[in-house]
Amino acid sequence: MKALVYDGPKAISHREVSDPNPRQDHVLIMIKAVGICGSDMHAYLGHDERRPAPLILGHEAAGIICEGARDGERVTINPLVSCGKCSACGTGRENICPDRQIISMPPREGAFAQYVTIPERNLVNVPTEYSLDKAALVEPLAVGWHT
């Protein structure tokens, strides 16, 4: 697949990389829209040691499920992948899961690529009346929301 790869401070390349292999409980998403976050810019400038090169950045994304029972569904992605088993996850506070991961930070590649894999529980369906360009903005809009 094609991906935009962070190669080091102020260096990116558009190149062919290996297709992602979905783990159990993960699905393959064909990325159709992705935002550029301030954290992507910090990484690009070399100001984020949590994002070492080479790495595919991008975590504000929307696309289409391209396999399994939900093949063809339009979705946006919650980029925070939690364990789903700890007390924080059990009380709806996945943001403080001690084992949390975020796409675009190792060990998870990001969405500046044709495809990304993500747990099915991290997907939110996008109604057909909303564009996937708008759906890619759900993550930054949801940053300040918690029930």
Task: Label every PLM stretch briefly.
Residues 7, 18-19, 52-58, 104-108, ...:
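Short Gly/Pro-enriched turn/cap motifs at secondary-structure boundaries
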Residues 18-34, 47-87, 127-130:
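Glycine-rich beta-strand-centered segment in the early N-terminal region that forms part
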Residues 39-45:
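Cytochrome P450 core scaffold surrounding the K-helix E-X-X-R motif
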